[in-house]
Amino acid sequence: MNDSEFHRLADALWLTIEERLDSWDGDSDIDCEINGGVLTLSFENGSKIIINRQEPLHQVWLATKQGGYHFDLKGDEWICDRSGETFWDLLGQAATQQAGEKVSFR
């Protein structure tokens, strides 16, 4: 994958997150902000989830209260380079914990 393809795929990931949060009807307020290629989810309790792109590595990084994760694109899924879990599963788990209610991005 070249840099422009990586950015196109990362942009699509950011857009999907925004769209899913816009259509989410949970009780918790989750704000989504994109600034300089960094996507920040802010929760009512003051906690945050930070998602950013690491262009030199062609990775997406996820920072949560539970820890940090690095994802490589394998096929059409972003996969954690340590656990093998998908980006969507880990993001959903972290958002659920930080929102205090079930949040799904699938």
UniProtKB/Swiss-Prot annotation:
Annotated GO MF terms: ferric iron binding; ferrous iron binding
Gene Ontology CC annotations of this record: cytosol
Metal-binding in keyword set: yes
Keywords associated with the record: Iron, Metal-binding
Stored InterPro entries: CyaY, Frataxin/CyaY, Frataxin/CyaY_sf, Frataxin_CS
Family: Belongs to the frataxin family.
Known role: Involved in iron-sulfur (Fe-S) cluster assembly. May act as a regulator of Fe-S biogenesis.
Name this protein carries in UniProt: Iron-sulfur cluster assembly protein CyaY
Organism taxonomic ancestry: Bacteria, Pseudomonadati, Pseudomonadota, Gammaproteobacteria, Enterobacterales
